[in-house]
Design a protein with these regions (language model features):
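N-terminal small/glycine-rich loop or linker at the start of catalytic domains
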Residues: 1-13, 218-228
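Glycoside hydrolase catalytic-domain groove-lining segments
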Residues: 177-229, 244-247, 287
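Aromatic- and acidic-residue-enriched segments that line the glycan-binding/catalytic groove
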Residues: 51-59, 70, 81-108, 112, ...
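Short, acidic/polar
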Residues: 15-31, 240-248
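Aromatic-lined substrate-binding rim segments of carbohydrate-active enzymes
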Residues: 22-88, 94, 156-162
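Short, well-ordered coil/turn segments that N-cap beta-strands
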Residues: 4-8, 33-35, 69-75, 130-137, ...
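Carbohydrate-binding surfaces of carbohydrate-active enzymes
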Residues: 99, 110-140, 146-158, 164-166, ...
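Short, solvent-exposed turn/loop segments enriched in Gly/Ser/Thr/Pro and often Arg
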Residues: 37-44, 78-88, 137-142, 173-176, ...
Length: 316
């Protein structure tokens, strides 16, 4: 929109929230001074059966995006095709298993199904792009690939651009793509008491990708216990004040935006959860699984108010 923005984003998943509660959760984000919604799209949520796409009811992606726009949020859209998200097969439909596909690769059989899926969701996304008067300003391909395969990532970029997606393309946790036309951002999760660990990631990003904005596609809230082992919160809990310190450290390190993961976790209904993941996806997030405002919400709101007040200075 021609103005510099500090991206203060929160991740919410329509596939973990009943449609009747979508607007309530989005309004709570807006009231905490968030300006952006981070949103995965789960392929298998829409193509549970091969070739039969469903975008109705709780799967109404267009309505989800429209509600975010209605409450005044920009949108950071993340269609994968792989999303992880502790979701069944990371979003891949299970009918891909007998297809003898090499997932997350340029293997032709996989790419055939991948292109069909992306074509479908991009038709919904395209009218909502900021270049078309909507609110989607950033589009992520893949997710936490970590170890390269630049041609695969560039092919995904080519596919979505062919579909008319003309906003910046990014990915996360794959430093190998730095130096290409894809914006790369780390996920500076805290796995110890040292907030300097996350700050080091951002400072390295600024140094190695100086021509692109230093953005973190995910910063963790409490996460889930087994991600952290025994250091130092084996029960999965950590003080909200540690997240506050981490956010302030990232801002001081020069970050231009971040996406809370999760801002509202919701619920893994039915059998959609990944292996070893509970039905609850609460995450001890700012907005609790049942919609109550947790301690992190008020921390986020204080920081959000600060970011909004000094956005121009912080976005230089």
């Amino acid at each position: 929109n021609g103005k510099r923005k500090f991206i203060n984003s929160g991740e919410l998943h329509y596939f973990r929230i009943p449609r009747s509660q979508w607007k309530d959760r989005l309004l709570k984000c807006k009231r905490a001074f968030l300006n952006t919604l981070g949103a995965y799209i789960a392929w298998n949520w829409h193509e549970e059966k091969e070739g039969k796409f469903n975008f109705e009811g709780d799967r109404d992606l267009d309505k989800w995006i429209s509600l975010a726009e209605e409450v005044g949020l920009f949108i950071f859209i993340r269609p994968g095709p792989y999303i992880c998200s502790e979701w069944d097969m990371g979003g891949f439909p299970n009918w891909l298993i007998p297809k003898d596909c090499e997932l997350r690769s340029l293997e032709p059989n996989f790419m055939k199904y991948c292109i069909r899926y992306l074509d479908k969701v991009n038709k919904i996304i395209k009218p909502h792009l900021i270049t078309k008067g909507g609110k989607i300003f950033l589009y992520q391909v893949e997710n936490e690939f970590e170890v390269g395969d630049i041609p695969y990532h560039l092919k995904l970029k080519e596919i979505v651009e062919k579909d008319g997606i003309d906003v910046p393309i990014c990915t996360n946790e794959n430093a190998w793509v730095r130096g290409t036309d894809i914006i790369e951002g780390p996920d500076p999760y805290l796995r110890s008491w040292l907030i300097s660990d996350a700050m080091i990631k951002i400072k390295d990003l600024i140094k190695t990708q100086p021509d692109k904005p230093p953005f973190a596609p995910e910063i963790g809230t409490c996460m889930i216990g087994w991600f952290y082992g025994q250091l130092p919160f084996s029960d999965g809990y950590r003080p909200p004040e540690l997240d506050e310190a981490n956010l302030k450290g990232l801002i001081a390190a020069g970050i231009s935006g971040f996406n809370w993961y999760m801002y509202h976790g919701g619920t893994n209904i039915g059998y959609w959860t990944a292996r070893n993941i509970a039905t609850s996806y609460d995450f001890d997030a700012p907005i609790k699984e049942w919609g109550e405002l947790g301690k992190r919400y008020y921390i986020s709101r204080r920081i959000g108010g600060f970011l909004e007040s000094f956005e121009e200075e912080l976005s230089e």
